[in-house]
Structure formats: C-alpha cells, structure tokens
Amino acid sequence: MVSIVLGSQWGDEGKGKITDMLSQDATLCCRAAGGHNAGHTIVHEDVTYDFHILPSGLVSPKCINLIGAGTVFHVPSFFKELAAIEAKGLKGAAQRIFVSDRAHVCFDLHSVVDGLEEKGLGGRKVGTTGKGIGPCYSDKAARRGVRVGEILDEETFERKLRTLDTSYRTRFGDLAYDVEEEIARFKEYRNLLKPHIVDQLEFLQEHKNSPNTLVEGANALMLDLDHGTYPFVTSSSTGLGGAVQALALNPASIKSVIGVVKAYTTRVGSGPFPSEQLNGDGEKLQQVGREFGVTTGRRRRCGWLDLVLCRYSHAINHYTALNLTKLDILDDFDEIKVGVAYILPDGKRTTGTFPADPNVVDKIQVEYVTLPGWKSNTMGVKRYEDLPPNARAYIEFIEREIGGVPVKWIGTGPARDHMIARD
C-alpha cells in the first residue's frame, strides 16, 4: 500500500521528518516531482542531513529509493549530496538509490538561463531558486529536453545538449557557459550513473508487492503549476495528481495522503501571501523559527496560519491525515491569530476557495480568529495529553476548521523524536 506525504502550503513545512519516520517501515521511498530546488533537513541520531534531490528515505538502511519520472535531475548535485550524506555516516546509501530513465536532466545551462529569464522580468521576478528548474521543465514541455536514459547514449546525448546550447544562444546571445565543458563532465558521470538508472515501470513492478511504499512530495500545493499562486510557482505538479501521474500509481493502492502543515505560514520568494505579517509578529516568527531556506539560504516571509489556504489545499489533495509542524515556535506568543476567511475586493466572503488571479489575492483582507497562547515550553513533548490545554485547543480548532481531517502527528522541535503521534 502507498502513503503520500505532501506539503499543504508554500513549502518548507517540515515534510522531511514525517517522511523519515514513515520510511522506517517503508521498503520503497519515491520522489515524484521537482529537483535540487527542493530542500529539507532531517536530524537523525543527532546528525543533521540536508536533502535536496535525494529522497529522505535514505536514512533508513532497509529502504530502497527512487527519483521518479516527474523530477528533473541535476547530476552534479546528485553525486555531491550522496557523498555528503555518506560522509556523515549513511553508509551504503549509493546502493539504495535509483533514478528513472524518464526523468529529465537539469544542466548547468538551465541555471544560466534561469538567471537571465529572472533578470528579464525586472520588478516582476518570480523569485526562483536559480537552479534551472523552470527552463528544464520548459524544455521537457517543448519536447526538446534530454532524459536521464539518454545519458547512456553518448552520441544522442551530445547532439541534443549542443542543440539546446545553440537554441539558447540564438535567444540570449553569448552565455556564461561552455557546452564542451559540460559534455566532458558527463563523460566521467556516464559510467558512475549507469548502476543507478532504471526503467521505472519495470522497477516499480518489481516492487509492486511492497507492503509499505512511501511517496515524498517536494515543494507544496501552493507552488503547483496548475493549482498554486501562478505565476509565482514552481514548474511541476506538486500535488496528489502529480504523484499519481509521475509514478503511474494505482489510485486504489493509496491508503493515506498526509498533508504537512506548519503551525504558522511561510513562503520564500515573490508572490501573494494573504496572511503575511510585516510587523513584529512576523519578525518574531522568522527569528524564533529560524526561517531560512535550506536550498537558497533566503529569509522566509512569515505570517499566521491561513486555514482558507489549507481548506483549498485539502480540497485538491484529499488529505486523510495532517502533520502539524513547529508547534513549539508559537510557545511565547500571548495570542495567536488564525486566518479563517477572505474578504475579496468585491466584498464577497469566502472560506475555502483561493482566487486564481494574483492581483485579486494581493487585495484580499484576511478575517482572523484570535486564540489564546499557552506561554509554556512544548519543545520535545511526546504525548498529546502533556501539551498545555491552549495548545491542544489550537490543534483541535484546526481539525474542526479543515473538515475534521485528523492531526495525527505534531512536531514539537527539530529532533527526529520531537514528534507526538496520536492514535
């Protein structure tokens, strides 16, 4: 049976920890979308690991891991990240990681183009990570991309990469990029990659009787190309539908869809953010929560929990359970606000829909409910009944407001065991 972990906001919700926990019983862990633009941190046996392109199921020695067809694959980052986690003690990780031959290759060329495209937008920048993700997915959609399996065919690979280089030079002129240098690097990568590249369908059929398959979402629903705050989104399908498509999942095999919700809201980069707090509360959330991006180091924008957004996310991803993270960051607030409705520019009140037009979203007025804080330390609490009454009331308010979806896990700190599991 399949469990899927998905971000419900704008990313950085803390998906890695629940994935790490669930991977202990998983025999297969898969990434379905995104690339090395994703980022999360796992603290495992007092060692901190930063994951980007690799599935975090690698922390479990019995878990096989797949980077699936919906991803974009930056080869240097793959080997760098693999070496880094093995150097920290995850021995044998290289023998447990595979990549679909249908994933697309993200080149250094794409990163150069990403920067040029962002520069061309001027004040309307999307705020990308600069990793080349958007240009790579653009090449995929335009049917000119290079797939991982083609790396093994030297002649085809080099022809297609040179064609990409020529097409981008036609568009932008001279580039700070040497295609022959990249081709030379791949001559070294080719044999190193070969043991990791698999026919995805064949690979998944070999594991179809896996009692516990875990799908690890990247980014989050509000960064989804179709359902997110377009154009301030990533370039892939980050929700439930994207996971099913990328991994050819049988929907009947899905036993749980876990939405990861930060106890407040953050986003990196540009774009609408209705509950953002450009005040002392936002500053406090940023400082106490240490809200800096794992991938870029950029400071995250912070605001109160937005339940309109969460209801919208649930309506698309159909969560069966929630993991509420970073509850402890709210410990020192006298009062905690929660967004429960939007007042649209035309005066209409909505509680579960998110407008498609970013100009409309920018003019939304958020209706808040103010709840009492608990003013006591929850870090490391491991039993629900040991939480302060007001903290439990906060959690139960969220459950009611998101249609009764149970909050089954509650994060109370950065360590792997700083998690409450409710029956």
UniProtKB/Swiss-Prot annotation:
Q: Which domain of life is it from?
A: Eukaryota
Q: Which residues are recorded as binding GTP? A: 11-17, 39-41, 300, 326-328, 411-413
Q: Where does substrate bind?
A: V294, T295, T296, G297, R298, R299, R300
What SMART domains does the record tag this protein with?
A: Adenylsucc_synt (SM00788)
The UniProt record gives the binding positions of Mg(2+) as: D12, G39
Pathway-wise, it operates in: Purine metabolism; AMP biosynthesis via de novo pathway; AMP from IMP: step 1/2
The transmembrane residues are none
Q: Where is the active site?
A: D12 (proton acceptor), H40 (proton donor)
Q: What are the protein's UniProt keywords?
A: Cytoplasm, GTP-binding, Ligase, Magnesium, Metal-binding, Nucleotide-binding, Purine biosynthesis
Its UniProt entry gives the catalysed reaction(s) as: IMP + L-aspartate + GTP = N(6)-(1,2-dicarboxyethyl)-AMP + GDP + phosphate + 2 H(+)
Q: What is its EC number?
A: 6.3.4.4
What is its subcellular localisation?
A: Cytoplasm
Cofactor(s) this protein cannot do without: Mg(2+)
**A GO term from the CC aspect:** cytoplasm
Q: Which Pfam families match?
A: Adenylsucc_synt
The entry marks the following residues as binding IMP, namely D12, E13, G14, K15, N37, A38, G39, H40, T129, R143, N219, T234, R298
Biological process, per Gene Ontology? 'de novo' AMP biosynthetic process; IMP metabolic process
Q: What coarse category fits the chief subcellular location reported for this protein?
A: cytoplasm
Q: What does the entry comment about cofactor binding?
A: Binds 1 Mg(2+) ion per subunit.
Q: What does this protein do?
A: Plays an important role in the de novo pathway and in the salvage pathway of purine nucleotide biosynthesis. Catalyzes the first committed step in the biosynthesis of AMP from IMP.
Quaternary form? Homodimer.
Q: Which NCBIfam families match?
A: PRK01117.1, purA
The entry assigns this protein to a family as follows: Belongs to the adenylosuccinate synthetase family.
Q: Which HAMAP family would you find in this protein's record?
A: Adenylosucc_synth (MF_00011)
In Swiss-Prot or TrEMBL terms, this protein is called Adenylosuccinate synthetase
The lineage, from the top, is: Eukaryota, Fungi, Dikarya, Ascomycota, Pezizomycotina
